[in-house]
Amino acid sequence: MLAADKKKKVIDKFKTHATDTGSPQVQIAILTEEVKDLTEHLRGHKKDFSSRRGLIKKVGERRRLMKYLKREDQKAYDDLMAKLKI
């Protein structure tokens, strides 16, 4: 789970309009930050299997959203992948 201030920064960076909080682009960006945080946590806590399971779930959810975005709006998908460096 991201801290509120960090989540707000991610939303502000990737929103598509003024009140956007749930577009696929924003959701993918938030999940990417959560994946980065969990990956860093697991480097130091190798036996934390519940966090590992959470990481796998978040990666799967992000993959599904990326697949949806690619299918619906290829240009937005390409722009997002370039911004996130995925």
For each feature predicted by the language model, list its residue ranges.
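Extended, charge-rich alpha-helical interface modules
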Residues: 1-86
